[in-house]
UniProtKB/Swiss-Prot annotation:
This is Na(+)/H(+) antiporter NhaB. Belongs to the NhaB Na(+)/H(+) (TC 2.A.34) antiporter family. One of its GO terms (molecular function) is sodium:proton antiporter activity. InterPro entries: Na+/H+_antiporter_NhaB. It catalyses: 2 Na(+)(in) + 3 H(+)(out) = 2 Na(+)(out) + 3 H(+)(in). The lineage of its organism: Bacteria, Pseudomonadati, Pseudomonadota, Gammaproteobacteria, Aeromonadales. GO terms for cellular component: plasma membrane. It comes from Aeromonas hydrophila subsp. hydrophila (strain ATCC 7966 / DSM 30187 / BCRC 13018 / CCUG 14551 / JCM 1027 / KCTC 2358 / NCIMB 9240 / NCTC 8049). It comes from the Bacteria. Na(+)/H(+) antiporter that extrudes sodium in exchange for external protons. It is a multi-pass membrane protein. The chain crosses the membrane at residues 25-45, 52-72, 89-109, 130-164, 204-224, 242-262, 307-327, 350-370, 391-411, 448-468, 479-499, 505-525. It is found in: Cell inner membrane.
């Protein structure tokens, strides 16, 4: 039946998204200019809530399009400027380079990753031990590498596992080409196993994601905001780890205990075991790969292992920007394994580029937060508090704001304000260093509550794997909830009760030396 041009425009708008979703986005676009005219501050927070809505509905429509429309309108009506958006993008160029090059680099190491993790999956029969292994490995890697890189590895591995089983359950051989996004060919008898396998992979993904937060908070190079805070406090790698330890050690231990508890008790969507049918297929796949592995294949694995070593050393020692190391991985991995066709290279960039564009939209929202000073009332309230109450309030304020905004931005804002207070002699050097710990742990730990707070979580939510595993925004929040409560509360208790006394003990033991000379330069805010 022919349709009018107007109906065609309506159908084309946001494609296959539900009609109610399209209506909601149009309503947002209509309301925002009116709200901005009446009260810019309220309009700013309204935009933040709307953007969170687009993330929450990621399985209905990829957030880039609706979020991008909201961001474009925000610039047009004056909530922020194109110059401020560009400033945010320039300030975060390393994150953007990382997404463009590092994620693509990991793609060319899939053979090695599948080889290692298939062995791990087959040999560890206990789901609890396997979950703990994923959490620990992610935590260890995230202490030295960027969390986005670690999540890219985990996504690559999980996608590989999913594709293998999906291919066999669709009646195909290991060597046959297959589209693992299409369930139509999956045998009816295998659908329950496929659903169980999805639940199994979902839980492993979430344990690994939490592991990146547990490890990332511990060291100077673990997260971008750690570097900013550590630089302003004048801490080296060792001093940073020691100063954070009164909070990070109890949190790390309790985080691992939570991993065991939720698996054993099958709470919050955890506890799904690997179906026997899937395990047999993985074992068959392992034997198939071993039998068919040629000298060239072995050479590729050796090359990829050497590149993995370079990747870890390069990132841990900060030999270059993360994205540039990723570019070197692409060049080395492709040239030494014989991948030279342009279309073969292009596949590697398919996963990361949509998210890179989405992150640019996210930074546009951060630009609105800055220009409309949405966090200013909270910051002023915390700084006006008594010194004894400041540690807990800084931790809580950072945690709450990091749940809705980029934790790098939140950490930078607060360390700026605290540094200003130090230079104006409003607080002592001792108080400044304790507050720096509270800010760092506050931005890193409670932010696991939602995908908004950590770029690695957002990357996982918007990856091509998330819809395959039925990993929605709501499900991520639900599965993160036990970790949010444990990490947040243990972190709060440690900041309030342990940080001061243990820091004093470190001074007495000679592990730390108080530097009364404050650095003169303020960090540059995004």
């Amino acid at each position: 039946m022919p349709i009018s041009l107007g109906q065609a425009f309506a159908r084309n708008f946001l494609g296959n998204a539900p009609q109610w979703y399209k209506a909601a986005i149009l309503l947002f676009l209509l309301i925002n200019p009116i709200a901005f005219y009446l009260d810019p501050f309220i309009a700013g927070w309204l935009l933040v809530v709307e953007f969170i809505f687009t993330l929450a509905m990621a399985l209905k429509c990829y957030p880039l399009q609706p979020g991008g429309l909201l961001a474009i309108e925000a610039v047009l009506i004056g909530m922020t400027s194109a110059k401020q958006v560009k400033h945010e993008l320039v300030a975060n160029i390393e994150v953007l380079l990382l997404l463009v090059f590092m994620v693509a680099g990991i793609y060319f190491m899939k053979q090695l990753l599948l080889y290692v993790f298939t062995k791990l999956l087959i040999r560890i029969h206990s789901k609890t031990l396997l979950s703990l292994a994923f959490c620990l490995v992610s935590a260890f890697l995230s202490a030295f590498l960027d969390a986005l890189t670690v999540i890219a590895v985990v996504i690559s591995v999980a996608t590989g596992f999913y594709a293998i089983y999906h291919k066999v359950s669709s009646g195909k051989e290991f060597g046959n080409p297959h589209d693992h996004t299409d369930d139509d060919a999956v045998n009816e008898l295998n659908r329950q196993h496929l659903d169980d396998f999805r639940a199994f992979l979902r839980s492993l993904m979430m344990h690994a994601a939490i592991g990146t937060a547990l490890g990332g908070v511990c060291t100077l190079v673990g997260e971008p905001q750690n570097l900013i805070i550590g630089e302003q406090a004048g801490w080296n790698f060792g001093e940073f780890a020691i100063r954070m330890s009164p909070v990070t050690v109890p949190v790390f231990i309790c985080g691992l205990l939570t991993c065991v508890l939720v698996e054993k008790c099958r709470w919050f969507g955890y506890g799904a075991k690997l179906p026997d049918a899937v395990r047999r297929i993985m074992e068959d796949y392992n034997r198939y790969e071993e039998a068919g592995r040629t000298a060239q294949d072995k050479a590729k694995l050796i090359v990829q292992a050497a590149i993995a070593l370079w990747l870890i050393l390069g990132l841990a020692m900060h030999l270059a920007a993360v994205g540039l190391i990723g570019l070197s991985v692409i060049v080395l991995a492709t040239s030494l394994t014989g991948i030279t066709e342009e279309h073969s290279l292009g596949k590697a960039f398919q996963e990361a580029l949509p998210f890179t564009a989405l992150l640019a939209v996210f930074f546009s929202v951060v630009a609105v937060i800055i220009d409309q000073q949405l966090f200013k009332p909270v910051i002023q309230w915390v700084l006006a508090a008594e010194p004894d109450a400041q540690l807990a309030l800084f931790y809580l304020a950072n945690g709450l704001l990091s749940m809705v905004s980029d934790n790098v931005f939140v950490g930078t804002v607060y360390i700026n304000e605290v540094k200003t207070a130090l230079l104006n002699n409003a607080i002592s050097r001792e108080q400044f260093e304790l507050l720096a710990v509270a800010i760092n742990t506050g931005t890193n730990l409670p932010s696991v509550a939602t995908p908004n707070g950590q770029a690695a979580f957002l990357f996982m939510l918007t990856s091509a794997l998330a819809p395959l595993l039925r990993l929605s925004y709501g499900r991520m929040v639900w599965m993160a909830l036990p970790y949010t409560l444990v990490l947040g509360l243990v972190g709060f208790f440690s900041v309030e009760m342990l940080l001061g006394p243990l820091t004093d003990w470190f001074y007495q033991a000679g592990w730390l030396v108080l530097d009364n000379v404050a650095p003169a330069a303020l960090p540059v805010l995004h």
